[in-house]
C-alpha cells in the first residue's frame, strides 16, 4: 500500500511540474472561524493535507515573486515556549533550546509571526523570496544544532495512515531542479559557470543501487566500487590534468509525466579535484570501476541532498506530524504543516533518522523514483544492443543527451534512434577485446563501453551532428515525397479505384526496401547527408506520372497503334461487309418483335430458305458452341420440333454440317405434320438476340442473297412473287442491318431489325420541326472572345432547339405497350464485333456529390463540354496520325440526358416519386428467354404495319415561342447580346440529382475505321485519360464530381446495347425519362451553325457501324490500340520466375542425361517416357537413398516398395506405392507409417504413399514423395509432400 501511494506521489509531482499552479491562496483574517479555515475537516490528517497543498502552491509559485499563504494551524504566540514545547511533542528540559532553534530557522527562512491575542489561532504570513532550500543551495541547509525529535527506545512508533502520507508527499513533491536534471537535461545551467569540466555519469553497482546510493548519501560505503555504464560531457574536457571535475551521477528514472517522460534522474553530485579527478578521468578512459570511498570524499553534500529535498521533507514531515499528534497532550487538530516542517533538522540528519527507523519504507519511496531493477548488463544489451554503435552512442544519447526540444532526435523513441544509427560509420575494434555477447558483469560492461572509440567527447559530438544531419535528411526526404505525391494527387484527377492504387503505389515507390536502402547507402557515404530526396521525382514511377499529365507525351510513350492498310477495292468490299453503309432516312423496312416471335422467324428461316440455299449458316444461327466435355454424338440430340407452314425446299436431300460432321438433312415429318430439323435441341439453342445478330451482321451471301434479306422478308410459298421479290431486294440490300433492343414497360424487351426508317418524320421531328436559329451577333459564326462567350452561345442555341421536344411534356412520355410504337420511344443499338466502328459513341456519366454542394449551371456545363471536345480532338489527332483533322472545325456531337425533373414536372423524376429508375443507357442482351416470352404484348406482322405511324408527333407547323431570349433582336450590339446569353445560361441549373449523363458521338476521320469493339474499348479508355488532363474541365466541375471515372469502357462488348440519341428510357412506372437530346457544342470556327445543328439528327453520325458520306470506304483499319502497362495499371503477371510446369518432362529428363526407356509417343511429351522404367529405375532409387539418410527408422518399409496405378499426365507422372515382399502377398497391410509423428493405436499404420515425377520452377526434373495420413494432427487424410529430390543421370541429390 505504501509503495502504491508513493507512486501516486511521484505521478502528481510530475503533473505539477508540467502544469504549474497559478492561483494564489488568499490571506485569511485572524477572525476567521474554524469552520471556514477547515471546512469539513474531521481529523488532523485532513488538516495536514490541506495545509500541505497550500505549501506546495507556495513552493511552486514562490520563485521570484511575493506570495502570501495563510496558515490556519493553531500556533502558540511568539515566546510561548510551553505551548511550543507541547506542540513539538517534546517534554524534556531542552524545549527552550528547540524553541530558539525554531525561531532561528524561521528567521533564516524569512518567516515572520503575527499572533492574534483574541484567538488560539495564528496566521503566518510568508512574504519571503524563494528559499535557498527550494533550489540547489551553496551552503548548509539547516543549523547543525537542530535535532529531529525521535521516540525513545521504549516508545511506540506512531505513523499516520499510508494513504494520507502518500497524498501529502505527492502534494509536497516538487523537484526544484527537475527540469535541469531530467532526461539528460542541461545540468550545466544549474551549476556555477566557473566549473572547468562537467560530466554526467550513469552508474551501476553489484548490489541494489538504490540502497547503496542512500547509504552513500549518508557517507557510508556498502560496496567498494561503482561501475560506469555511460558518461556524457556537459562542457568541453579539461585541457590539463588535475583540474576540477564535476560529475553528476544518474540512475534510470521510473516515473515521469506524459509531456516529459524522464529517462534518468540525478542521485548525487561530486566535485573531484587533484588526484581524485585524475583517477576519475583515468577510470572513464579505461573503464575501471570508481572507488566508493573516493566518491564519498568528493561528494557535494549540499548539492546532492538538494536533489532529494522534496522527498526527504515530505517523508520527515509526515512522520514527525504523526509522532507529535500521538504525543501525550497533543491536539491533532492544532498541527501545522509549516510548523512541523520547520522543526525538521538538516536534510542529512532527517534522512539518517528516516533510514534508521523506516529504512524499508524510505527505500520503497526511492524505488518509485529510480528504476534500478536491472541486475546484470544483459538488460542494457537487450535494450540497446547488440551492435557497439547502438550500445555506446545510442545509449549515451538516449539516456544522457536527448531532450524533447534539442532539435535532433529527442522526441524519437529508442527504436527510432537505433534506426538512425544504422548508417553511422562503424567503429574500429574495441580496445578492451570484449564483444557485446561476452558482457557478463558490470565491470566488463564498463570496460567495454569506456574503451570504445565512440565513448570519447569527440565521438559524442560527432554522433550528435550525425543524428542532426540524418534527421534533417530524412525529414527532407519524407517532405519531398509527400509534397510530390500531394502534387500528383490533385493533378491526376483519377477515378476512385485508380486513386487508391495511386496512393499505395506512390508511397510504395518512395518507401520500398530498395528506395530506403539507396537512401541509407547515400547517407552512409556522406555522413548522414542524403540528397536523393529532391531527386526522387526522377524515378520511373514519377516519370510515368508526369507522362500521365501530358497527353501527347503519355500517348507517345505508352500507346501502340497497329494499322492495316487496305487497297481501295478491298476497302470497298470491307465497308460493304462490315458496315451499315449510309442509313436511309426515309421509308421503312424492318420489324420490331418480342423474342418469341423473333425465335419463330429465325427457326422458320433456318429450317427452310437457308438450308435450301445450301449454306452451313443455318446451324451456326441456332446452335450454341458445343461443350468440349460432351462426348455424345450431335445426331442423337439434334432434333428440334419447329412449326412450319410449308416446306419451301421440297423433299430433296441436303447435307448440313453439324458439330463437324455432315449429316443428311431430315426429310421425314412427325405425326402432327411437323418436320424434324437437323438443328440442335432447345437446350443447345442460342439466345434469340445472338441468333438475330448473327443473321443481321453476317457477311455470307449464299447464292447472292444476304441472310438479313431472308430475315426481313417472309418466304411464304403462298406468295407467288416471293422469290422474285427476295432476289430483287437482296440485290439492293447487301450490307449488314442495325439491330436494336427496345425496352418495354414492366421489364420486358423487344428486338428490332430496321434497314431504313423515317428518321426525320418520326424520330427527330419534334426537335427540329419549326426550329428557328437564334439571332446571334454578327461575329457569332466566327470565333468568340472567350470560352465563356462561346459557351453562352452554345446554350442559347440549345435552348432554342429543345423548346418543343416531346420530352418536356408529360402527356407524351408514357411508354407504349406495342413494340412498334415503343421503337420510337426507346431504341438501343446492339453492338457486335462483326462490324467496323465508324462512329465512336462515348457513354459519359458524371457522378455528382451530394446535393448540399449545389448543381452546375448550364453555362458551366457548356464550358466543361467544350474542354471535353478539346481533349477528344487532341486525342484524335494523335491516334489518327494520317487524317486531316482541324481542331477548330472537327465535329463532335454531344447529347445530354434530360434532367430528372425536366420542365418542372415533379412526377417525371424517379427520385421524387420514390421509384428507382434504372439506367437503361447500356444493357446486356437478353439472358433469360423466359422473361421475354412471358411478356404478352407481342403482336403479328400485320399489327406492326398498322402501328408504324406515331400519333404523338408534334405538328411541324407549330409556332416557336417568340419570347425566347435567343430570338430577341440584337440591336444593342453583339457584346450586350452575349452578356444577356451568359446571364441566362448562368441562371439555369442542371436538375440531375445523382449523375449527369452525356452521349458523345465522335466520327472516325477519313480514311480510318476501328476493327471491332476491343479497339473501341481501348480508345474510350484513352478518352477518359485525355479528359481528366483538361484543366478547364476540372476547374469547371471539380466541386461537383464525386468520381473521376466517367467514361464507361465496358459497354463495348458483343451483345451489349447502347441507347441512341433522341430516345428515352422507361422507368418502373412505365414513364419515359432521361431522353438524350442535343447539347450543342460548336467548334471554335464553325462555318455554318445551322448545318452543324442539323447534323445532330443524322443517324449516320451516331450509329456505330454507319459509314459517313465523307468516309464511305476506309482504307486504314486500326486493328489494335495497346496501352502499355502504365504506372497505375495492375500487374497481372505471375510473380517470380515463370513456372516450368509447361516444359516437357521428356525434354527436362533429356537435359540432365536421363534417356527415356522408349521412344513412343510425341517427342517431348510425357507419353514419350516409359513411366514404369522412369519410376523403378530413376525415381524410386533416389527416394530410397533420401529415406535411408534422413528417415532410417522407416527405411525398411520403402526398401521393397513398388509402384502401382501409374498415371501419366501432361508434364507429370504419378503412381501409388505399395509395400512389396512376401508379407504383402500374404495379406499384410500395405500402408506405411507416418514420417512425421509416431502415432499409436488405429492411426499407427494408415499412411498412403505416392510418388510424383514432374519438372520444377528451374526446369529440372524431380521426384516427390506424397503421403496421406488419417491422423488428426496430420490433417486427416490431407495430401502432403514430405520431400523432393532432384533427378540426375549421375546421382540423385
Swiss-Prot record:
Compartments, record wording: Host nucleus
Site residues by UniProt (Essential for primase activity): 843, 845
Cellular compartments per GO CC: host cell nucleus
Name of the protein: DNA primase
Oligomeric form and interacting partners: Associates with the helicase and the primase-associated factor to form the helicase-primase factor.
This enzyme's EC code(s): 2.7.7.-
Protein family (similarity comment): Belongs to the herpesviridae DNA primase family.
GO molecular function: DNA-directed RNA polymerase activity; zinc ion binding
Keyword Zinc among record annotations: yes
Pfam families per record: Herpes_UL52
Zinc finger (CHC2-type): 1234-1274
Keyword DNA-binding set for record: no
HAMAP family: HSV_PRIM
Keyword terms of this UniProt record: DNA replication, Host nucleus, Metal-binding, Transferase, Zinc, Zinc-finger
Transmembrane segment boundaries: none
Species of provenance: Psittacid herpesvirus 1 (isolate Amazon parrot/-/97-0001/1997)
Function text: Essential component of the helicase/primase complex. Unwinds the DNA at the replication forks and generates single-stranded DNA for both leading and lagging strand synthesis. The primase initiates primer synthesis and thereby produces large amount of short RNA primers on the lagging strand that the polymerase elongates using dNTPs.
Matches recorded under InterPro entries: HSV_PRIM
GO term, biological process aspect, one: bidirectional double-stranded viral DNA replication
Cystine connections: none
